């Protein structure tokens, strides 16, 4: 399942906006990224996509389910009505395998409309196709209670890593449909993640050997003993497939982090090994917890919704993430899109970012620059350094504007052969800028050449 196209009419800043999402004929990646200044409308786009998709989730759950509605405050100022229309491509239907089938049979289009009170309606909601698509998945689930469902999730900028609970007061079920719980309105929920993880691990330990027991055996007999090797192999064979998916996803995004687990001594908590050192998850940095919670939540939902797949991370889905670079170290920002595609290869990702590192290190990513209510596709970003992306795509100076003006003035004086003024400007900048400043080092070479010519 993929979002094929989207239209916004009189919604927020957008009077009439139409766009496609990757993959497209010219962008084979499954990732689309929106960039733009604060207030440009990036969040409005993602929230509108989430609102449209909420109707599919609601009608997969129940035949007459209702999704989220357009709010009155989302209607553009001065307009009477607003409309959002989404087209989804889904080839999981039985007729998709028929040789002469119409390709349009795989496209489903529905619209959500809202009119201000006291105004005459000029647009109307249309929900026939979303009901038809949802009915297909309900039939699949009726015929096979292990049938896979598509993940649909939205992680807003307000997502936060909540306090990890020590006790679970009420138990929940975790079947395929539960993968949709709060998937479009809450973001990361460590409480539900902890509850799910503990339940799965309890089941895993009942059929295998706990990590605690294995650790005690290693202390007594050693890692090279036949006893430890036999029990370790037995544990590996009894690993829970869903937990394995979550652990492997976190390890892929966070090198050096392994063996996520629940520990019960000295008190109940989630633990993880970081570079061989066991830590309480609560001890991790905000960036580490944010990454773990985001990746863990996506993997958990995929695992729940694809129980019959050998690798649940290969499940189908659509994931929307606002400000995907939030709290992340630049090193993780640079590899983020590549890891999303490699770890979750059948999910379509729609992201927003303020980071040049996110969009300059992945091939075939579809990048839209948002400005004054309009979208402009920007190609050829792969391999550009962060400064080029800042200047060419994000319309931001690569350094302090005053410093840049003075560097430009220095280079102009050097080109004009004005040695005295150039020496003065260079001395002033050398006093303020750190040793090893690249542009100043280049200017120093040019200044030395000019001095030698004048000697």
Stretches found by the model and what they are:
Residues 130, 134, 148, 190, ...:
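A structural signal for well-ordered alpha-helical scaffolds and beta->alpha junctions
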Residues 2, 141-143, 338-342, 357-455:
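RecA-like P-loop NTPase motor core
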Residues 49, 53, 134-144, 246-254, ...:
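Hydrophobic, Leu/Ile/Phe/Ala-enriched alpha-helical segments that form helix-helix packing faces
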Residues 70-73, 108-111, 216-226, 269-275, ...:
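Amphipathic alpha-helical surface "interface" segments used
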Residues 2, 87, 182-291, 296-314:
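Extended helical coiled-coil dimerization/tether regions that scaffold
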Residues 1-63, 259, 264-398:
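Switch/communication elements of ASCE P-loop NTPase nucleotide-binding domains
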Residues 1-205, 414, 434-455:
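P-loop NTPase switch/coupling surface
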């Amino acid at each position: 399942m993929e979002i094929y196209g989207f239209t916004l009419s009189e919604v927020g800043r957008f009077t009439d906006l139409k766009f496609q999402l990757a993959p497209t004929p010219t962008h084979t990646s499954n990732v689309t990224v929106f960039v733009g200044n604060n207030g440009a409308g990036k969040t409005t786009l993602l929230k509108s996509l989430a609102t449209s998709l909420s109707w599919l989730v609601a009608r997969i759950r129940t035949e007459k389910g209702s999704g989220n509605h357009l709010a009155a405050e989302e209607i553009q100022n001065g307009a009477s009505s607003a409309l959002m229309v989404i087209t989804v491509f889904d080839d999981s239907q039985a007729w998709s395998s028929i040789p002469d089938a119409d390709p349009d049979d795989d496209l489903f289009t529905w619209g959500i409309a809202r009119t201000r009170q006291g105004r005459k309606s000029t647009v109307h909601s249309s929900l026939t196709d979303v009901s038809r698509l949802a009915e297909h998945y309900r039939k699949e689930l009726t015929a096979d209670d292990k049938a896979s469902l598509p993940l649909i999730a939205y992680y807003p900028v307000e997502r936060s890593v909540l306090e990890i609970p020590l006790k679970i007061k009420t138990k929940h079920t975790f079947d395929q449909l539960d993968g949709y719980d709060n998937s479009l309105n809450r973001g990361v929920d460590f409480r539900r993640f902890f509850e799910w993880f503990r339940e799965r691990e309890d089941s895993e330990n009942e059929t295998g050997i706990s990590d605690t027991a294995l650790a005690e055996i290693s202390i007594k007999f050693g890692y090279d003993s036949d006893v430890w090797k036999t029990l370790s192999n037995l544990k590996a064979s009894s690993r829970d497939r869903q937990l394995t998916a979550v652990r492997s996803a976190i390890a892929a995004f966070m090198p050096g982090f392994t063996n996520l687990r629940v520990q019960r001594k000295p008190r109940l908590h989630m633990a993880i090994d970081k570079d061989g050192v066991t830590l309480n998850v609560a001890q991790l940095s905000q960036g580490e917890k944010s990454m773990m919670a985001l990746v863990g939540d996506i993997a958990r939902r995929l695992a729940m919704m694809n129980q019959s797949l050998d690798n649940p991370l290969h499940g189908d889905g659509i994931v929307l993430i606002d400000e995907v670079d939030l709290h992340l170290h630049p090193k993780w920002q640079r590899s983020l899109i590549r890891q999303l595609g490699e770890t979750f290869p059948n999910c379509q990702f729609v992201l927003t970012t303020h980071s040049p590192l996110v969009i300059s290190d992945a091939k075939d990513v579809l990048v839209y620059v948002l400005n004054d209510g309009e979208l402009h596709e920007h190609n050829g970003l792969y391999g550009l350094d962060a400064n080029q992306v800042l200047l060419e795509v994000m319309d931001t100076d690569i350094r302090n504007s005053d410093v840049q003006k003075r560097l430009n003035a220095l280079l102009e004086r050097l080109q004009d052969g004005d040695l005295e003024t150039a020496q003065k400007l260079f001395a002033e900048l050398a006093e303020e800028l750190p040793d090893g400043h690249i542009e100043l080092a280049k200017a120093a070479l040019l200044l030395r050449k000019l001095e030698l010519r004048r000697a």
